[in-house]
Amino acid sequence: MNPFSKMIAAALALSEKAVENTLELLEEGCTIPFISRYRKEKTGNMDEVKIEAVAQANEKYKEMAKRKETILKTIGDQGKLSAELQQRIDNCWDATELEDIYLPFKPKRRTRAQVAREQGLEPLAQLLLLQRERNPEQAARKFVGDKVSDVEAALQGAKDIIAETVSENEQSRNQIRGEFRRGAIITSKVVAKKKDEEDAQRFSDYFDFSEPLKRCSSHRLLAMRRGEAAGFLRVSISADDEACTTKLKRHYVHGFGECQTLVGEAVDDAFKRLLKPSIETEFAAQSKQKADEEAIVVFAENLRQLLLAAPLGQKRVMAVDPGFANGCKTACLDAQGNLVHHEIVYPHPPRSKRMEATAAMKRMVRQYQVEAMAVGNGTASRETSEWLNEIDFEHPVDVYVVSEDGASIYSASKIAREEFPDEDVTVRGAVSIGRRLMDPLAELVKIDPKSIGVGQYQHDVDQSQLKKSLDSVVMSCVNSVGVNLNTASQHLLTYVSGLGPTLAKNIVEYRRENGAFSSRSQLKKVPRLGPSAYEQCAGFLRIPGARNPLDNSAVHPERYSLVETMAKDQGVTVKQLVEDKALQKKIDIRKYVSGEVGMPTLTDIMAELDKPGLDPRGEVEKFEFDASIKAIEDLQVGMVVPGIVTNITKFGAFVDIGVHNDGLVHVSQMANRYVSDPSEVVKLHEHVMVRVTEVDLKRKRIALSMKQL
C-alpha cells in the first residue's frame, strides 16, 4: 500500500481506494491518458486533472520523505536526535514546518551566535533570558577573560545568542509569517540612473508602485520580477516592522529592567538582521511560485485550446506566407499535406505585379486543384487575404487566416530540415502554415510550445515546471483526439500514450518497410513494442478503413471480445452493429457489467459504436475583418468590430481586429457581470464582436469592451 494515499485522498477530497488504485497504476507505468480513458472503474471515474493532481501530490510527499531522511541523518550525526524530535519529524508533512524544526540543527556558516557560544557565553544568554538578574553587567564580568575582552563584549555576545535563538524559534517565525500574511506590502521602485532608458519604459507602471501582496495579481508580480531581473526595478516585500517586534517582545520580554532592555534589544536585532530577511525571502519565493503556477495554468489552457482547434481536414491546400518587398511565398499541398509545388508572387508594393500574381494564383489553383487557402497572419496578411478573396477562381476556394506564431522557429528546426532537406526556410514556413489549417494538432506538436505565443511571461516562470505542464497538455490533446496510425508523423506518434521517441521511430520505419497497417494487432510486430506499450498505445491509434471497424475507434482491443459478444447476442457481426444505430439502442449494457467492466467503460464503448473515431475538435470556421478598417488610425471610439481572440491572460484577452496591433479586452470589460477568469467567457481563436473604448496612437494601444454586445 502506498504510504501517502490516505493523506492524498484527504487533501484532494477523493476516495482513498480510488487514490490507492491510481497510484498503483502510475507505479506500473500507465500513462495518465490511459488511466483516465480505460481504467475508470479503478479510479472512480477520475478525469485527467484529478489523476494529475494525485500524481503531483505523490511526488511532493516522496520528495518530502527524502528530505526527512537527510534531516534525520544530519541531526543524528550531531548526536542530538531525541525520540521526541524523531517523532515530530516523522509526523510532519508540511514543508515549512519541517524546515523550521530543522533550522536550529541546520549546518550554517560561522555566525555571531556560534562565536559567542565558543566564547562560553551561552550561560549568560540563558541568564538574561530568565530576566531575574537585577545587575546584568555584574553577572557579565564573570565571563570576561582570554576569549572575552570586556563586559560590553560579553553582553553583546549573549544578545547575539538570544537573537539567533529567537530567529530559529518556530513560534517566533510563525508570528512573523502571520504578520506578513495579513499585511505584507510589495513595493517596486525604479533604479534612478536607469529611469530614462528606453527599455525601462516598458516597466513605467512599476516605477513607484506598492500594493498588498495578497492582492497582487500574478501578471503584475511577474512583470515586476522581469523588470528587476532586467536591472530597471528594485522590488521588496515588507510587513509592519513595529507590529512584528511588538509581537515578539510580548513573548520574550517580561516586565521592565536592565535585563528586559537587553533582551528587547536582542529581539529587535533578531527581527531586523535575521527574521525579517528570512521571511521576506520566503514570501518572495512563495509569491513567485504562486505566480508561476497561475501563469503556467493560463499557458497550458491556452495551449490546449490551440492544439484542439478545429481542423480543415484532408483537403488540397495552398499556403501563403504573405509579405511586401519579399513577396508572398506560396506552397501547394496535397490532401495528405505533402508539398507538391512552391513559388513566390509579388502582388503588393514595391514590386506591385498584381496581374502576374493573380494569373499565377489561378494557374496553381487549377493545376493542383486547390480547395482552400491558408494565409499567415503576419505582415501583409490583411492585404493578401483581401486580394485573394477578390480573385475569380474557376471553382470556389475558401480563404482562411492562420496564426504564424512559431512557424519561423519550425522552419529552422531539425524536424523541418529532416522533412524538407532541399528547401529553404521560407518554403518550410509556408508549408507549416498550410498544415496548421489542415490539422493544427499534428503540426503544432513539432514546435516548442513556448514559441507559439499564447501565454503570459512564459519565459520568466520556472522552466522545468512549465515544460512538464506543457508536455502533459500536448500528450493529453494528442490522445484525446487519437492518431491515424498510417499517416501520423514520427513526432506526433511520440506523444501517443506508451510510445515515446524510440517506438515512434520504429513504427514509422516498420510502416515504410511493410506498408500501411491493416490492424492494430500488427503493432505487436514493431521492434521493441512489447505487451505493456501495446496496452498503453493501442486504444489511441486509429486505422481508417480497417477490416475491423473497432480499429478505427477508441474501443480498446482488450474490450473487442465484449463488443463481439454484444453483436453475437443481437445476431449480427461487429461491422453490422457499428453501422446499425437502431440495433445499438436495443442493447441493455447493464447485462454486460462484470467484475472488470463497469458502467463507465460500457457507456464509453456505446458512444464509440455510435460515432467511431469521431474527431472531437469540430469544424473550422471562416472569418472576415471589417473591410472599412485597415489601420489603427481608422479606429474610432464606439465602433463595434469583429475580431479573433489571439491570447488569453489572467487580466483579459487580446483580440486581433485587423489593424496589425491586437486590442485588449480587460477582464472587467468582458461581460455585463463579474468575471474572475477571462477563459470563462472566451476561448482562443474564438470569433467575437468588440467595441472600441480607447485608442492610443502614440503607444499603439487599443482598449476594447465586450459589454452589452
Locations of regions flagged by a protein language model:
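Long, highly charged, low-complexity intrinsically disordered interaction regions
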Residues: 4, 62-80, 90, 409, ...
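Short beta-alpha junctions and helix-cap segments that line functional grooves
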Residues: 317-319, 329, 385-388, 519-522, ...
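Structured, non-catalytic alpha/beta "coupling" segments that mediate domain-domain communication
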Residues: 74, 88, 98-101, 227-240, ...
